[in-house]
Amino acid sequence: MQLSRSTLSRLAIAALTVGLMLAAAGGTASAASIRRVWMTGYAAPGTPARLDTVGVIKIGSTKAKNVLVIEPGTSGGGAYFVPLAKWLVAKAPGWQVWAVERRENRLERQGELDKFKKGEVTAQQFFRYYLGYLTEPDSEPHYKPVSESKATEDGARNWGMNVAVQDLHVVIGAAKALGGKVVLGGHSLGGTVVTAYATWDFAGKLGAEGLSGLVFIDGGSSPVPATAAEAEAALEKLSKKSPWLAFGGVPAPLLGLFSMTGSALANLAPKDASLAQGWPPLPSFLRPHDKEGAEVPATNEATFGYGVNVGSSPPNLAAAQVHAGEGIVEAGPGEPWTWNGTGALTPLQRYAEMLSGAGLKGVDGSEWYYPERLTIDSAAVGNGITNPAQAVLGEDAVHGGELPTSLHILAINSELDTMFGEGFNTLKFAEGLAEQSAIPSGNVTLVDVRSSYAHNDPNGAYPNNEFVSHLVPFLEGL
């Protein structure tokens, strides 16, 4: 049954919420209230009602009326933003941060991760449950991935921009119901979703109506959309394969499991000899090597750092990178190599907390199953201007020249802009979006850190962070 938009709006305000108080991991804002809720979302065609939900991790005082809603990027989960959010609400106590958990995160089975976080299973048991079993002959209980046939049956091939935007509309409606200001932000592909939402046609009203600001964290929408032929070809190809994106060439759910297990082991068993390194299927590019190119034994922390740090992380994982320090260093004789975080922008342990959901129950910062349809659809947003590809894909991001002139925009880039050239330029995308609607230049803040920040440094850098130093006054000035 399809729910009307008015029904969805009412559901957003009086949402079917399952509130779970989540333990706040230590740090500068450990007193911040953190809770997760699931709301009834958009009734997507072909999707069972149990999956027509959208999650939110809410950080900050329940008395705060202003809300920054943040949409994750490709293969990102809501917990990724929690360390940043705790810091923000400590600096701007009149605000809450709501980190979106897209519907596909309902497919994850986090029970064993929760046990590991509570110390109820060993590191070896935890790793074996999610990955190690793949090379072991015994039949002990282990993680069972969602089958391609089941995902297809549940409509996952249709979880594109329309589904993401309609689910987000529920979240925005709930945030507006608090009576304060609402700002929508997004990281990476989440920035494309921000543009799509702001310019979307909701029964004649554009999504930006009632929003005070937009925040683009190294992401946005190119003004040059895909062609109709390209959109048709992408849909045809998707119809014959898994609904899930193989991000960086690594199929689902393996990339998400690599991220989750690697970060959790780095966080909870950092000095132990690497479990992943002893697992035969681990790709060579994720195995620590010395400067001469020889593989070296390393700790869990060092193995995780090697895979995400600029300088050792491979180009196909640029979207996972941070500046986490100098890298792996040799320890004593017979000891595994360890991590040297000297000079880090994003401390490696902080990044491990972001990706593993440290101290939180039932969530992590990685998305194990990410629908490829959302990436296909993102190419047609075209900064919110009508184009033939949108018609092919069923998108309504058409009000790109009609945004309120009162809207404020903040955008920050990273080294990805230099890697991908003019085809990917966060600041130009944001500036162009503002110019289309004659938003005054004084309302637009552009932060250029492409010479120093990796893709995840804006969200992870601590205690010095160019993004935070601009975001806090941006929010408080609205």
Q: Regions from the language model: what does each represent?
A:
Residues 117-176:
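Alpha/beta-hydrolase active-site loop
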